Amino acid sequence: MRKFLSLIAITFLMMSCSEDVKFNDPGLQGLKNDSFWRAADVRAYVTDGKLTIEAYAQYEVLTLGTSSTNLGKYKLGSTNSSNFASYATTFDDVAIEYATIPTPGPVSTVSLTNVGTGYTDATSVATTGGSGSGLSVNIKANANGGVTEVTLLSRGNGYMAGDIVTITGGNLNSKFRVVNVQNSNGEIEITQFDNVKMTISGKFKFNAVNSNNNPLSADVVNFQSGEFYNVQIYPSI
């Protein structure tokens, strides 16, 4: 009988834990530095077509922004300041702020801007240009000698979002743009926008750097597996 009661107690505890992590409707939650984080209140605003989501927990504010409400993915930490994430906490009058702002670092994501000519498939290809050094890539080229795919091999350091980098070899004319760097990157994905009920849903993940240079805070805050669901869009204020 005691074993049976213990089994019931364990089952009830497991159900309670499962219920605790079930997604709120509406709600916003994710993993902050590998620990579960959930907003106590969340709301969204649209101003001039740009989306802002504000999520509040005790002493904490998480803000997500995208350049539109269109479905799709929005890269963070790039030169497009309309796509951003920020996190702030204030406790005992000590303010700590993080943001996905352009900052020097190892390259995270690139976008090919010029395929160039004279290239062939190659590995460990050096690069030139940009703010940093040490960046090398693997490349694939088409029959005309144009680069069609760039894969990061060594991410280097000291690069900035927006840097234009040249791939060596070929006719030295294939280039790509640094979209963002590892310590300030991520994406927001809008998966659903209901313009009748005025609600929005999606996912997010990002690294954000210490933006107010507070020596008491870590250099980077990380959010992973983030989701927002049926967040109400309120009139802009």
Role assignments for model-derived ranges:
Residues 186-237:
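C-terminal or internal capping secondary-structure element at the end of a domain, subdomain, or sheet
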Residues 7, 11-40:
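Bacterial Sec-dependent N-terminal signal peptides
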Residues 103-182:
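Conserved, function-critical positions that sit in or immediately flank catalytic
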Residues 28, 45-104, 179-197, 209-211:
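Surface-exposed helix/loop patches within compact recognition domains
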Residues 38-49, 135-137, 178:
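Short, surface-exposed loop motifs enriched in S/T, G, D/E and P with embedded aromatic residues
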Residues 19-26, 45-50, 119-123, 160-161:
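A short, compositionally biased
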Residues 62, 66-74, 82, 111-113, ...:
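Extracytoplasmic low-complexity repetitive segments enriched in small/polar residues
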Residues 1-5:
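Bacterial N-terminal signal peptides that target proteins for export
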